[in-house]
Structures are given as C-alpha cells and as structure tokens.
C-alpha cells in the first residue's frame, strides 16, 4: 500500500497542475503594452472584424442557395444568437482587462490545460482566417483585372494539382499579409489609424449600397411570382442562420485588445455592443436591398452585390462596390493580424508558450516578435495552401472558444470573490502561492451562515424550501449542477442534430429523449439560479445568468455537431499537437508552476489520521501555530 502512495500523490499533483487557475490580480491595469485605444478605436476594430468579405460573398450565397429573401431573418436570428456569446465576452473584458480573450477568460476560471487548448485553437483560427481573407482579397482584386494576375503567375511560375495546395502560388495574398504585419508592428496607433481609414471607406460604400439599392428596389421581387419571401420555408431560414452566424465572429478582437484600451471596463462592453449592432444593421439592410433589386434566384453567389448593380445597368456602381469590398477585407485582415500576436503574447507572458514572444518593443510597445513570426507563417500558408477545405475548421475553433467563455462566466459568477491583497510583511510575495488539499471545503463545527451569503451558497430565502442543498460547502452543488447542465446540453444537441438522420429514433423516442434532457437542463438551471452569485456594481455584468450563457452553450454545441467528421478529425490532430507543446514546454515553464517551486509555496497535504476531529485540526496547523510543548519534555 505504501508503494502506491507516491503514484497516487503524483497523479493528484499532475491533476492539480492541469487545473491550476491564474489569479485575478488587483493591478490589472498595469501592462507593458500602451493603453491608447478609445471606445471608437475598439468599435471600429470590431466592425472591421465582422463586416468584411462575408457582406459581399456570404449574403448572396445564402440568399440564392439557402434562404431566399428571408436571408434578412437569418441574419437577424444569427445576430441575436451572437449577442449571447458577445455578452459573455463583454463581461469578461470588463472584469479582466488583459489581452488574451477566450484564453485568459478560461485560465482565470476553469484551469491551465483548458486555457492552453483554447488559446491554441484561437491561434489557428486567426492564422487560417488571415490566410483565407488574404486569398479572398487576392481573388477579388484579380477578378477586377479579368484574372490577369492568375494567368501571369500560372504562365511564368507554374501551377499544380496537389491536394490541400492551391492551383498556383498566390504571391499577392502573401504580400498583403506581410505588408499588413509590417504596419501592425509599428504600434497600436498606426494599426488603429489604418483601420479607421478602411472602415470609414467600407461603411460609406455600405451606405451607398443601401441608399441606391432602396432607390432601385422592386417589391415584386418578394412576390409569390418570384417564389415568395421565404421560398425555402422555416428550415431554410434556420439553415441560413447557421451560415450567417459566422459573419459575426469578429467581435472577439475587441476582448483581445482590452489591455491596450484606455478605459477597458467601460469601453470593451460598449464597443462590443455597438460594433455588433452596426454589423447586424449592415447585414440586414444590405440583404434587404439586394433581394429587392433583383430576383433572388438570379443572384451571382460569388459577387452578388456587384452583379446586382450590373443587372440593373449601373456598372459604375459595381466598381464602387468592388472597391468597398477590398477595403472591407483590409479591415478584417488588420483585425486578425492585430489580435494574433496578442494572444501569443498572453500565452508567452504566462509561460505556456515560448518566452521570445513575450518580448514587447520598448518604443512601439507591441509584441513585435509574435507579429512578424506569425505574420510570416500566415503569409506562407496563404502562398501555398488551398484554404477552402479548412473553413469549417475555423468555425469549430470559434464555437469551442464561445462555449468555454460562456461556461467560464457561470463558473466565475459562483466563485468567491478574491479579497484584495495588501502589500506588507504578512503578504506573500509575487511568487508565493498558498494551497491546501481540502481546507477550501473545511467548515468548523458550529459555524453558522453569515448574514450576507457567499457566492456559491444557497440563497437564504430558499433555505426553508431547499434545505437539502444547504448542507454542502459553497460551490459544491453548483459544480454538480453545471456538470449536469453541460451533459444535458450535449445530449440535447445530439438529439436535435442526429436524432432522425443518424440515430434513426422513432418519433415517440425522439420526443421522449428530447423532453427528458430538456427537463434535466432546466432543473440544473434552476439549481444554479438558487445559489448566490457575485454582484459588482462597478462592472458590466450579464443579466439573467445562468440562462443567457446556458443558451449560448446549447447553440454553440448544436452548430459544432453540424460540422463534418473530417473537421473533427483535423481538430483532433491539432489538439494532439497542442498537447505535445503543453506537456513538452508549457507545464514546466508556466508562471503558476514557478510559484509552486519548493520553498516558494506553503502547500500542506493532509492525510486524515484515525483520530478525533480535534486531532485532525491540530495536525493541519503550520509549525509556527502548533501549541508549545511542555518545557519538561524539551531536550
């Protein structure tokens, strides 16, 4: 038995390492980066991340092939669904005004390993997303010049037919990424100025499209003669919602930039709300005028807006639309390349990624090494790869990040607030970490509840009715309820997505299983709602927690389950690569690991003796607090 104890202890220690949290420090406003971004800067950064190629490509494709004129309803529902995730990011961005976005939010609430995996996937999302936008930018510009750029490259450089590779090397896409990376490395102010310029042009072009589009509108294009407003029915609207949801994924760049915001606790929630409203308004208005200008079934899915003006005889307007699309894609590219090195910087600053990427240039106050290194990597991928097959891969990483952030909001709301640390002789140093194996759940006999319950405790008003939940330590019931909620959310998603097509459930079995899982889901929400939460009047907080984060989780799970199995296979391979990096480097170099080095912590592992409670409590006391021995027994 004694030989097994070290193995059990080592496994327990490993689990402790994997789930250790990054502490929320009081000095969250101190940073090596330059806090220079205003609310307007953050808002335009978010608008640039959302209103890009999707407006000029996705709108026409969904209208023609999925939803018809009802695409505007698809965008409206998708905007509401995105708002659920955006609210979670807004609260975290105000509460933790540091760079890192979903990675950091997961680190402070759920644990180190989960945070690393989320950060690892967000990195890939930005890299592949930047390369895809650059190739779309190159292709759109090439089409304006009758594909002369592609023809020249294939003639003088060559082409190939290799799986996962493009038909020809896209030097233009690689070049625009390198140029954008150079501007981003010059500082946040330079990037913000460029983003302002391109965003202003893009918004003016959108305004032009809406005004001229309403002038040219022909309401009979929504009539029954043309197929009606919703030719694909309700199912088409919902299928369009799944596609349109990805048009709003750019708001997380605001949270990733919160460490450079002048007043993040106010600016981040405000910028997320305003940018999402602007993006939703732009998508809904443009899809409305597009389907009113020409019949939805005559749209060109590759360049719907420009082609619509061509069909109405306004070729000059088509060139304005093409110029606006180029500017819009520039804003998306700048937003992605601006956020990418900041995620790398956050992970490197925490010791989970290579330390060279934590270096901040003293003059520009930006992580130049990460900007240039990952800019080169993105350019290389854009040069060679055919990224169409990896688009769904981006969706999976984004949805997974949304799910973890929503879960983190619930976890953090029911955690006990950290008392502010005061510097002094009695305070532990910056590399000191105090832990206990079970003292977090220890309550002395005879302790009564305080007048103000702690987060995670049962609400006093409900104790007469739910007293059977009151005998547990704060947070214990919440943890179980959260686990049941997540399990039931996954089951609901599986039933909705696979119930008829894959599982081949009979109708009564489908309804029964969906009803049972929904009841479990609602009961877990009621149990969570019966417990005390953190309330901060000085910060933005989401209303209706845990309902809003829970709805976001269910939606994200359903969308993830709709992705192809090849996407999950590629995702698993990427996760394995991330685990190799974490266990090979991150777990040993983590800053939290440095705080736990021998001599820098005060961790006490307790083995319960076969004695009374009094003996157990005495055994837990540190040596300095042990009762003095009888002088007669001293040697």
From Swiss-Prot:
The modification Phosphoserine is found at residues 422, 427. InterPro entries: AA/rel_permease1, CAT_C. The keyword Zinc does not apply. The chain crosses the membrane at residues 42-62, 66-86, 113-133, 197-217, 229-249, 270-290, 318-338, 365-385, 391-411, 478-498, 508-528, 539-559, 567-587. The keyword Membrane applies. Keywords: Amino-acid transport, Glycoprotein, Membrane, Phosphoprotein, Transmembrane, Transmembrane helix, Transport. It is a multi-pass membrane protein. GO terms for biological process: amino acid transport. One of its GO terms (molecular function) is basic amino acid transmembrane transporter activity. Glycans are attached at residues 151, 195, 221, 500, 601. GO terms for cellular component: membrane; plasma membrane. It is found in: Membrane. Involved in the transport of the cationic amino acids (arginine, lysine and ornithine). Belongs to the amino acid-polyamine-organocation (APC) superfamily. Cationic amino acid transporter (CAT) (TC 2.A.3.3) family. PANTHER family: CATIONIC AMINO ACID TRANSPORTER 4, INNER MEMBRANE TRANSPORTER YGJI-RELATED. This is Cationic amino acid transporter 4. It comes from Homo sapiens. The lineage of its organism: Eukaryota, Metazoa, Chordata, Craniata, Vertebrata. The gene is SLC7A4.
């Amino acid at each position: 038995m004694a030989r097994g104890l070290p193995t059990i202890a080592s496994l327990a220690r490993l689990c402790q390492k994997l789930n250790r949290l990054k502490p929320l420090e009081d000095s969250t406003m101190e940073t090596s980066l330059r806090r220079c971004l205003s609310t307007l800067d953050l808002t335009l950064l978010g608008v640039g991340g959302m209103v890009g190629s999707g407006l000029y490509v996705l709108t026409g494709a969904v209208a023609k092939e999925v939803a018809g004129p009802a695409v505007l309803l698809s965008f409206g529902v998708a905007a509401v669904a995105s708002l659920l995730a955006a609210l979670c990011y807004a609260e975290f961005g105000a509460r933790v005004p540091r760079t890192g976005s979903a990675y950091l939010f997961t680190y402070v609430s759920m644990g180190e390993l989960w945070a690393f995996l989320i950060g690892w996937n967000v990195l890939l999302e930005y890299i592949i997303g930047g390369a895809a936008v650059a190739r779309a930018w190159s292709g759109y510009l090439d089409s304006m010049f009758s594909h002369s750029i592609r023809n020249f490259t294939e003639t003088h450089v060559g082409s190939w037919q290799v799986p996962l590779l493009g038909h020809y090397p896209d030097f233009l896409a690689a070049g625009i990424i390198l140029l954008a990376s150079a501007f981003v490395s010059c500082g946040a102010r330079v990037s913000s100025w460029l983003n302002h310029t391109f965003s202003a042009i893009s918004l003016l072009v959108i305004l032009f499209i809406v005004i001229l589009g309403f002038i040219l509108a022909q309401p009979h294009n929504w009539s029954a003669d043309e197929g009606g407003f919703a030719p694909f029915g309700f199912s088409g609207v919902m299928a369009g919602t799944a596609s349109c949801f990805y048009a709003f994924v750019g708001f997380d760049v605001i949270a990733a930039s919160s460490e450079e915001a002048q007043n993040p606790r106010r600016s981040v929630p405000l910028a997320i709300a305003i940018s999402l409203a602007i993006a939703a308004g732009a998508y809904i208005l443009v899809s409305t005028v597009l389907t009113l200008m020409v019949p939805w079934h005559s749209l060109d899915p590759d360049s719907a807006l420009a082609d619509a003006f061509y069909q109405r005889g306004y070729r000059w307007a088509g060139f304005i639309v093409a110029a606006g699309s180029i500017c819009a894609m520039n804003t998306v590219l700048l937003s992605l390349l601006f956020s990418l090195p900041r995620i790398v910087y956050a992970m490197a600053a925490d010791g989970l990624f290579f330390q060279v990427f934590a270096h901040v240039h003293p003059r520009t106050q930006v992580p130049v090494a990460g900007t240039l290194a990952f800019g080169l990597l993105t350019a290389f991928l854009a040069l060679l790869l055919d990224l169409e097959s990896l688009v769904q891969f981006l969706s999976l990483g984004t949805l997974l990040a949304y799910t973890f952030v929503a879960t983190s909001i619930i976890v953090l709301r029911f955690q006990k607030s950290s008392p502010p640390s005061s510097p002094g002789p009695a305070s532990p140093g910056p590399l000191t970490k105090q832990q206990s194996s079970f003292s977090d759940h220890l309550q002395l006999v005879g302790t009564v509840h305080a007048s103000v319950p702690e987060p995670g405790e049962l609400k006093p008003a409900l104790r007469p009715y739910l007293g059977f939940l009151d005998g547990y330590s704060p947070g214990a019931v919440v943890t179980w309820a959260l686990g049941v909620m997540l399990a039931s959310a996954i089951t609901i998603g599986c039933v909705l997505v696979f119930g008829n097509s894959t599982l081949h459930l009979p109708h009564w079995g489908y309804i029964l299983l969906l009803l049972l899982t929904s009841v479990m889901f609602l009961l877990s929400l009621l149990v969570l709602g019966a417990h005390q939460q953190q309330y901060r009047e000085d910060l933005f907080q989401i209303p209706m927690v845990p309902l809003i984060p829970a709805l976001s989780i269910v939606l994200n799970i359903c969308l993830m389950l709709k992705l192809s199995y090849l996407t999950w296979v590629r995702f698993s391979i990427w996760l394995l690569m991330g685990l190799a990096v974490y266990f090979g480097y991150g777990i040993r170099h983590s800053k939290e690991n440095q705080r736990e080095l021998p001599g820098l912590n005060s961790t006490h592992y307790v083995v319960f003796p076969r004695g009374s409670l009094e003996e157990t409590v005495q055994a837990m006391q540190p040596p300095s607090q042990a009762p003095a021995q009888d002088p007669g027994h001293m040697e």
